[in-house]
Design a protein with these regions (language model features):
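Proline- and Ser/Thr-rich low-complexity, intrinsically disordered segments
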Residues: 1-175
């Protein structure tokens, strides 16, 4: 100043905490991301921290501006989080389909190349073989059987509905 005095001060410039984001799968169907192969009942969310709060979100695909994304199928979803100062952080998450539920039905009884031992008999059987989906499975046969093998069958057509742990179903029949 005019008297020759000098004043000194120091200023510390501090960075805000680094903005981070972590997307995660929030749907859980017995360990699967979506209930059935091809279903769109999955969900995901993103957690943001650091930066300057007042976050906005943008998901692709989908264009959602929420921190959660619902009614989605298998695939990779990317989210960009923007804080109040315009800083960004991106993360992604991948939802996977469970194996497709499949069913085959076959005659399992064999009496010298015949399905039933005698004309008019009821000692035939049929087996439902299931793969994919999410175990355990339930069986509902048209004759009332509720196991993988329907027994005591007479000649005719029998149908079965198999349901997995997530409610996915497949139908089959045998004559």
């Amino acid at each position: 100043d005019a008297l020759g005095c000098i004043a000194t001060t120091s200023v510390t410039v501090v960075n805000p905490p680094q903005l981070t984001s972590a997307a995660s799968i929030t749907s859980d169907y017995n360990g699967q991301d979506v209930s059935c192969f091809g279903s769109t009942d999955g969900s995901t969310s993103v957690a943001a921290s650091g930066g300057t709060p007042g976050y906005t979100y943008f998901w692709t695909p989908g264009g959602s501006s929420n921190s959660t994304l619902s009614t989605i199928g298998a695939g990779t979803y990317n989210v960009t989080v923007t804080d109040l100062n315009g800083c960004t952080s991106s993360s992604s998450v991948t939802l996977v389909n469970p194996p497709s539920l499949s069913l085959s039905v076959a005659i399992s009884s064999n009496y010298n190349s015949q399905n039933i031992s005698c004309f008019g008999g009821n000692d035939g059987s049929a087996t439902a073989t299931v793969s994919g989906g999410t175990a355990p499975y339930t069986y509902s046969w048209s004759n009332g059987a509720t196991t993988q093998i329907a027994s005591n069958l007479s000649a005719g057509t029998y149908s079965v509905v198999v349901t997995d742990a997530n409610g996915c179903t497949r139908n089959g029949s045998i004559t």
